Amino acid sequence: MGFQTTDVKLIQALSAVQQFVPMYGLPDHLMIHVEYHSDAAMSWRRENDELFLRCSGVGQALMLLGRALTLHDRSAESLIPRLDQLGAMLDVSRNSVYTLPTMKKFLCQLALMGYTECYLYMEDTYELPGYPYFGYRRGRYSVQEQKELDDFAASVQHS
C-alpha cells in the first residue's frame, strides 16, 4: 500500500505506523489530502484513489485514516468529537512487560483508533539507576527503552 501526501507531519506519523501495522486489501496507491482547521468538526471523504481529510491535527488525521480504511460500507463520514483526549492504561507490572516492538505496534493501533494518550502502570518493572536489585529478576524497561517508547509515542501523536 502506498500512501502519498504533501503533509510532512502526516508523512512522519504514517511511516512510523506502517512499520508496525500492515495495511491489507487496499488500493496500490492512495493520495491523502489534509485540510487543517480549528473548529471541532472533522470529516473524511474517499473518491477513487484519493482521500480527503478535514481535521485539527495529525492525531485526528490518523484516526480519520483508520476509519476510512476500515469502514468499507461508506465513502464519507462527518464526526464531532465528544472528547478532547482519549487514553488507555496498560498494566505492565507483575512480569507482563511487553517487548518494545509489541508496545510500538499497540501504540500505532491506538493512534489509528483515535487514542491520544497511553499510560503504563509499571510498579517495579523499570530500571532505577543506583539500585540494581529494584525489580530484581523481573522483566523491566531500561531508561533508554522508556525514552525510546516515549519518543515513538510522540511520533504517532500520543502525549
What residue spans do the PLM features occupy?
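Acidic, contiguous N-terminal accessory segments
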Residues: M1-E77
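Feature activates predominantly on carbohydrate-active enzymes
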Residues: Q19, E47-S159
